[in-house]
């Protein structure tokens, strides 16, 4: 049985919120002096915000990325973020430098796993219905 309880609107809010927190994380968690940790967090945060802006969901602007693709991207970004302390060699820095990357990365994987690829809204546009071969909801 598949458990998908985070709807696309909540997913959008989480995308922008987590992206912004990652951009600010070097100063929030005081690892702005660890260059690799700082730039990975900022880069991934900006990538998450850009992906959210381009996703075809309620809070997307360009609506170019289908939601199911977005969720796969979230899981991959999460895995990259969780592994980044070892990939970029800052795992031996203080816990404040590597732990946020691991925790947020694993959370991203989990969020992607329990997020619905289908919007709850009733106003699916024609392109979405054709793309996913789903009838409009009554």
Residue ranges, per PLM feature:
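Membrane-helix boundary elements
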Residues: 18-38
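Structural signature of hydrophobic alpha-helical transmembrane segments
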Residues: 37-47, 102
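Membrane-helix boundary/interface segments in integral membrane proteins
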Residues: 48-65
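Hydrophobic alpha-helical membrane segments
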Residues: 70-85
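Membrane-helix boundary connector in multi-pass membrane proteins
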Residues: 83-100
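Membrane-water interface at the C-terminal end of transmembrane alpha helices
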Residues: 88, 108-125
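Short, highly charged, low-complexity non-transmembrane loops/tails of multi-pass membrane proteins
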Residues: 124-138
């Amino acid at each position: 049985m598949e458990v998908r309880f985070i709807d696309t609107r909540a997913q959008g809010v989480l995308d922008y919120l987590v992206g912004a927190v990652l951009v600010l994380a070097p100063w929030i968690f005081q690892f702005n002096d660890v260059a690799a940790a700082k730039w990975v967090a900022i880069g991934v945060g900006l990538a998450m915000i850009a992906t959210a802006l381009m996703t075809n969901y309620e809070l997307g602007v360009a609506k170019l990325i289908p939601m199911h693709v977005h969720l796969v991207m979230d899981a991959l970004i999460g895995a990259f973020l969780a592994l980044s302390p070892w990939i970029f060699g800052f795992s031996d820095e203080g816990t404040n430098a590597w732990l946020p990357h691991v925790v947020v990365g694993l959370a991203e994987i989990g969020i992607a796993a329990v997020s619905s690829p289908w919007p709850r809204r009733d106003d699916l546009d024609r392109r979405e219905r054709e793309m996913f071969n789903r009838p409009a909801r009554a």
